[in-house]
């Protein structure tokens, strides 16, 4: 079973049901991976999502990634990649997969640049962050391609177009 805990700062209050959006994004991402069984597992797998401002994400990015600027999304996995497979044997009853943190200003700017609604872009970022929590990365080109393919599939199930498509003007 999956639980998605959402904490949104006031500047995210724009009429969007962020909790529903986050649950749908996390679920769609998980369904595209071999870890889809977690959605129906006896234990509780939790993903924590914080929707905050650029200043907080900037500070976290500087502290944990040594990058002195805000970024769109940060992911903090709490389970090592090689241990995810063994979660079915967990007797704890619950496991925190990790935290996903989005920066409002960066998200809004990027959505405007792409010509998509902020909620759609945030959905993409939550899918992306969820895949990181499940052990996926994009350091190497082949990893990036595999992760982007999973993102495309997950987003398509939510009715969202390919965010990586190259469009001609």
UniProtKB/Swiss-Prot annotation:
Gene Ontology CC annotations of this record: cytoplasm
UniProt-listed SUPFAM superfamilies: Metalloproteases ('zincins'), catalytic domain
E.C. designation(s): 3.1.-.-
Any GO MF annotation of the entry: zinc ion binding
Family: Belongs to the endoribonuclease YbeY family.
Protein name: Endoribonuclease YbeY
Protein residues bound to Zn(2+): 128, 132, 138
Gene3D superfamilies: Metalloproteases ('zincins'), catalytic domain
